[in-house]
């Protein structure tokens, strides 16, 4: 018989470090030897290592001397003090000395030159299948080591029982080749394995694990019954209890008992023919396996997959889990009622089912176990991971967050609220759950206990730090040592990948390709693609954007050019200008910001490019610009880039494209992109250029197919704010109209309103002076009614309906996400833009609906750019006017709901201070009316300004606050300011002076000099806020007020830039150059351009700067955020000559009235 004693007395120095250990069976703590206490403070006064080494006892050496030579191996290392690794908490300064790691089993995933610590399932933590038993000479030492560990856990030594058990195990292994654990040993092993699990944050409960011994079962049916008992015990009506069920151990690897599911309870994931996924994407492969094995799918988002159980190595069997054993929690939010509309839920019991318990050389491949949830497991990983349910953006939109702007931190705000909903929902249903902060605190306590009781605590920092909150949890600051002890829970290879099928007819045929063959095929394809791409012409695609639109189009362009070129898409601020000397093809997609400038992420490249004098590499290029034709500097930056590249010697591939957000921007981009692609293929002689299949994105949506849409009756009442919040990704709330006051005199032909909005309650929405209010208007009832009268085969105007679209494969209908369920009348009133002239693409689709051949041909002619632009700028027709011009059009309700553009909000600078009127928001609104056809056409009205002017007190106004971080009062209130705002450009400055007045009256703060430069036509006609300005001057809030009048009888026209030149040159220099003050400009783009030119002239003259130097000077002012512009587009692309016909900006086509559009 093999001698067990050499293993019994095997050197384990760390075990002798403890004079007393924790009793695993009664959970009592014993004291460690004082001289080797592993918990210390990080203090330079601590004893040195050499001193500590001299004080260490040597019990191992004494044991060796007293033992007979026949019972112990003497070739052990010389007695020495235990080596330790010092672990520090950088938050508290406390340190631990880890000695337990010396008992680690094998190596982890790290290599000498690289760390694999962030690999999900490293080989060191995975045990694969076996095809033969573990050899006795390998099993025996592991078995004896476990028996030693087990008996060392008792408070009082049981030497005789210990020695007897060692001898019995040794004999059993010698006789049978394996051994069986006793019931108590199994309980101890399962608990100890949880205690040793480095990736688990909830181990403080390890000793309370309930162990169900199912080693006697022999069939899959018995396995199912044991699992049902487990689920019933663990769920406990929501008061979750931790438990494990252990099935028979592995013998020769051919008779394994395994649960094929990753978790006992998990939701299915269905891969649909069009590539979309219904349910949990993480379960797609396993769900398909269940279907192949005979399960009938239900195609719901939250269908519980059946259990797939394998007994004694036989083929698996399916078992549906009884619904009464699956406790589910519906999700709701304590604040957001709409959260329930997401129809989310989650199961209460997290039970891992596919891991393997290793103990003493034995392997238990079937051992499902559970704890309870930490909230972030559901709220972050299950709901928000992009490869899971991925609800983050939808929640962000419903919250009204700026989901197009990463810097707004919308993801952080949304994920917190999702986690609030998860915790709230579980707690409301009295289901056990733990928040991540409490879990982190409990782990820190557990870790301290472990270092005191056994000198170490294996921990994987990457897994233990929660997926949100990071450094505000204590575990973030804790250094950790990761190692594998025994007993241990290991990962396994998925059972269906290694199972040897006995009945080949039941074997799923879907995955016939062997893994190695698949890897080789993928590798070969990757190498082939790399070589193919490397042989292609390189194309660099640059974008600059403020809203993200240019980036989206640039990436679409990259997808198109990847069909024949080797494209790379970069933001301008990521591009090194030196690469121009290496380019073959350069494509640029950019918007224009402010008064003809570049977006913020294009400033750096613009400055470098425009300073470049020569270029030796004569590459090809093409540019596409995005903008709004209401601005005089329409697409100016794109044209500037085009001209500069041309001057440097680069060769233009196609003319610069222009995408007008008021006129079919997307269609213009598609046409330019396809044309540029074709010319590039010809220019670079791309092989097979006439047979390249371009992406569907560039070929679809050019015709109207009524078979792809249908209307379904719906009974859900419309919540306007909720619908607008979801559609526009804004937090929309309603305010009531308090009052309106016309700020212009009765003699004026125009109207400018002071609109005062109020909210119920003691506190209104949060905003800062200078920020904008976005207002969602309603279309005029006459326009809506006129369109409704011309709809064919439509539902009743007030019948709620929802629009559904047919899937690409035509097999099912999908709810359209563009519009909420509503009546046709509501859609035309609140959601659809019926005043903007139809785009060319919309006219092309309308041509299909014309029953008169002449009208059809006329509509097709209008799709041509030259005819279209002339027709559009002359008539600027509303959609009703189009229907009147082409009376044979047969327009359906589904056409209107699917093809008309979305009505955009209008932005107004807030004209009040929240500190002064906390429950109110004031707006300065110019009511717009104009006639087309050089003043001879029909009268048109501004959508929002006309709607606001028609409201009665207490009427509701849906709105939201938009931040304007670049247009706010100085952080240092002592800095002097110059405010320049003619006409309605005065709007934000009223909020400035009201804020300064409040600070002076209630806080005793006296702000720096504030000079106002205002402009209007005549003092007795349109001098807005004249009395209030004078009052502010009397109270010292405004240091000086200068007004330019442009229509005084018998006097020359004077504008604000004239006042700057004539009266304020010295003040401008003092404020900007000497006192580091701020200058603000608010108004239309032409005024802003003229003011900027005047200021540059003044500065250049005073400081003797050339043109390049003065441009750099103002670039620095903007970089320092001391030159502020709030520009709106009050200029039409066509000129209306009649005096007073064109009013200030509340243009029905303008996305911004007093803000940047």
UniProtKB/Swiss-Prot annotation:
Residues that bind heme b: 200, 491
Family from the record: Belongs to the NOS family.
Cellular component, GO annotation: cortical cytoskeleton; cytosol; nucleus; perinuclear region of cytoplasm; peroxisome; plasma membrane
Pfam families given in the database record: FAD_binding_1, Flavodoxin_1, NAD_binding_1, NO_synthase
Listed name of the protein: Nitric oxide synthase, inducible
Named cofactor requirement(s): heme b; FAD; FMN; (6R)-L-erythro-5,6,7,8-tetrahydrobiopterin
Major localization listed first in the record, in broad terms: cytoplasm
EC numbers: 1.14.13.39
Record bears the keyword Cytoplasm: yes
Annotated region (Disordered), positions in chain: 29-64, 1138-1157
Region (Calmodulin-binding): 515-535
Binding site for FAD: 772, 906, 908-909, 924, 926, 930, 943-945
Gene Ontology biological process terms from the UniProt entry: arginine catabolic process; cellular response to lipopolysaccharide; cellular response to type II interferon; cellular response to xenobiotic stimulus; circadian rhythm; defense response to bacterium; Fc-gamma receptor signaling pathway involved in phagocytosis; inflammatory response
Purpose of the protein: Produces nitric oxide (NO) which is a messenger molecule with diverse functions throughout the body. In macrophages, NO mediates tumoricidal and bactericidal actions. Also has nitrosylase activity and mediates cysteine S-nitrosylation of cytoplasmic target proteins such PTGS2/COX2. As component of the iNOS-S100A8/9 transnitrosylase complex involved in the selective inflammatory stimulus-dependent S-nitrosylation of GAPDH implicated in regulation of the GAIT complex activity and probably multiple targets including ANXA5, EZR, MSN and VIM.
UniProt-recorded Gene Ontology molecular function terms: arginine binding; calmodulin binding; flavin adenine dinucleotide binding; FMN binding; heme binding; metal ion binding; NADP binding; nitric-oxide synthase activity
Domain FAD-binding FR-type, residue spans: 730-970
Residues holding L-arginine: 263, 372-373, 377
Ligand binding (NADP(+)): 750, 929, 984, 1017, 1046-1047, 1053, 1055, 1057, 1090
Activity regulation as described: Not stimulated by calcium/calmodulin.
Cofactor note: Binds 1 FAD.
Factors inducing expression: Little by LPS or ConA in spleen cells.
Residue window of motif DINNN-motif: 23-27
Keywords: Calmodulin-binding, Cytoplasm, FAD, Flavoprotein, FMN, Heme, Iron, Metal-binding, NADP, Oxidoreductase, Ubl conjugation, Zinc
Subunit structure: Homodimer. Interacts with NHERF1. Interacts with GAPDH; induced by oxidatively-modified low-densitity lipoprotein (LDL(ox)). Interacts with S100A8 and S100A9 to form the iNOS-S100A8/9 transnitrosylase complex. Interacts with SPSB1, SPSB2 and SPSB4. Interacts with ELOC and CUL5 in the presence of SPSB1 or SPSB2 or SPSB4. Forms a complex with ASL, ASS1 and HSP90AA1; the complex regulates cell-autonomous L-arginine synthesis and citrulline recycling while channeling extracellular L-arginine to nitric oxide synthesis pathway.
Gene encoding the protein: NOS2
Tissue expr: Detected in both stimulated and unstimulated immune cells and macrophages with little or no up-regulation following cellular stimulation with lipopolysaccharides (LPS) or concanavalin A (ConA).
